[in-house]
């Protein structure tokens, strides 16, 4: 059981943990209700370079209004489980009260990060008008790109890969690339270097000449 405000807080906490233990994330991507949470969280994370959303509702309450017939069960049972954005969410009275207090008009104008809004014009779960409202309410630089023929979960062949390519291409203009290794930092082909990170004594970072991997030795 969770609520929208807790989702936002989790994103902020995860960003801080990664910044403290590995490297500071530069790009925040969110889908559906997670996209709405990413938008609000981004207003509180100053180190972000860019934000991208996929099928995000303008008002988080919109995501549950699609299931209005089930929401009425909350009064009778206290909670109901719905599938939103491909995952099960328990909708309780507290969840609905939290959504009722969420006003995107109050925080979206404060988003000062480059924004990419991806949305399908035939999305039957979160309508394209949500993307238009997000675009209308946020500041530049911003871009709205339609994912033609895609469903809400991007399950049709090629749609998820297309969205990923769009985000990757668009974000390059804002992200700071890793410094290319030189001299002693270059790792020869066929060699891997492993070291324990400050994230914990069971966590290792393994580097090769082309990849960096994080492993758990527990």
Identify the function of each model-found stretch.
Residues 46-94:
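Hydrolase active-site cap/lid region
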Residues 138-153:
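Catalytic histidine neighborhood in serine/cysteine hydrolases
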Residues 150-162:
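Catalytic histidine-centered segment of alpha/beta-hydrolase-like enzymes
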Residues 170-218:
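Extended beta-strand/beta-hairpin segments
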Residues 113, 127-136:
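Short alpha-helix in the alpha/beta-hydrolase fold that links the catalytic acid
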Residues 2-21:
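Alpha/beta-hydrolase active-site loop
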Residues 21-32:
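Alpha/beta-hydrolase fold nucleophile elbow
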Residues 111, 117-119, 123:
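Short beta-strand/loop motif that positions the catalytic acidic residue
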């Amino acid at each position: 059981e969770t609520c929208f405000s807790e989702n936002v807080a989790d994103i902020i906490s995860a960003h801080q943990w990664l910044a403290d233990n590995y490297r500071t994330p530069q790009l925040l991507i969110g889908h559906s209700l997670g996209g709405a949470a990413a938008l609000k969280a981004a207003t509180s994370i100053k180190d972000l370079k860019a934000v991208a959303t996929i099928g995000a509702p303008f008002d988080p309450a919109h995501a549950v209004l699609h299931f209005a017939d089930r929401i009425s069960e909350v009064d009778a049972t206290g909670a109901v489980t719905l599938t939103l954005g491909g995952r099960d969410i328990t909708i309780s009275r507290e969840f609905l009260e939290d959504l009722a207090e969420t006003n995107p008009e109050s925080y979206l104008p404060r988003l000062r990060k480059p924004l990419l809004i991806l949305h399908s014009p035939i999305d039957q779960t979160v309508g394209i008008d949500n993307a238009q409202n997000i675009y209308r309410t946020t500041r530049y630089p911003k871009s709205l790109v339609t994912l033609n023929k895609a469903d809400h979960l991007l399950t049709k062949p090629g749609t998820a890969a297309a969205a990923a390519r769009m985000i990757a291409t668009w974000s390059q203009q804002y992200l700071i690339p890793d410094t290319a290794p030189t001299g002693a930092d270059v790792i020869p082909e066929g060699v891997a270097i492993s070291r324990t990170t400050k994230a914990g004594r069971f966590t290792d970072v393994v580097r090769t000449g082309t990849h960096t991997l994080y492993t758990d030795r527990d």
